[in-house]
């Protein structure tokens, strides 16, 4: 079991001009070691912004992966229940305070801790607010 944490101040699909995947996105997928990994996008920090979600689905859909979106502003329970299926959890930019508060309320922090301790490679990625959520202090 290996856990990779890849964090950046910005970049990836959300910064590409046409919404296409970047080398960073391909690298994150490659780290999973799976042929068709499940990639979960967590747009919580942006209040589950619909255009951000569409951009993710377009970019990652072209990479031959399976995709899911962790939505906590609507249908949170079902979304959190599916989270352990993810090989890669990619957390988007926005408000770190909102992100952490909603994760605690809905138990996402506990689910992620369990995922990290499992006998399976897990990749955790994030941009901006999504980068800072992986650290304490």
Summary of predicted features, one role per range:
Residues 95:
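Phosphate-centric recognition/catalysis
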Residues 98-137:
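Class I SAM-dependent methyltransferase SAM-binding "motif I" and its flanking Rossmann-like core
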Residues 1-92:
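N-terminal beta1-alpha1 cap of cysteine-dependent amidohydrolase-like domains
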């Amino acid at each position: 079991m290996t856990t990779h944490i890849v964090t950046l101040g910005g970049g990836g699909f959300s910064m590409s001009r046409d919404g296409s995947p970047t080398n960073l996105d391909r690298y994150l997928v490659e780290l999973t070691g799976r042929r068709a990994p499940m990639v979960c996008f967590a747009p919580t920090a942006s209040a589950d912004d619909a255009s951000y979600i569409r951009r993710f689905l377009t970019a990652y859909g072209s990479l031959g992966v399976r995709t899911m979106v962790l939505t906590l502003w609507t249908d949170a329970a079902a979304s959190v229940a599916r989270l352990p299926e993810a090989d890669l959890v990619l957390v988007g930019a926005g408000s770190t305070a909102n992100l952490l508060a909603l994760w605690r309320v809905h138990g996402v922090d506990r689910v992620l801790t369990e995922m990290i301790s499992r006998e399976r490679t897990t990749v955790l990625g994030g941009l901006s607010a999504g980068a800072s959520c992986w650290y304490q202090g």
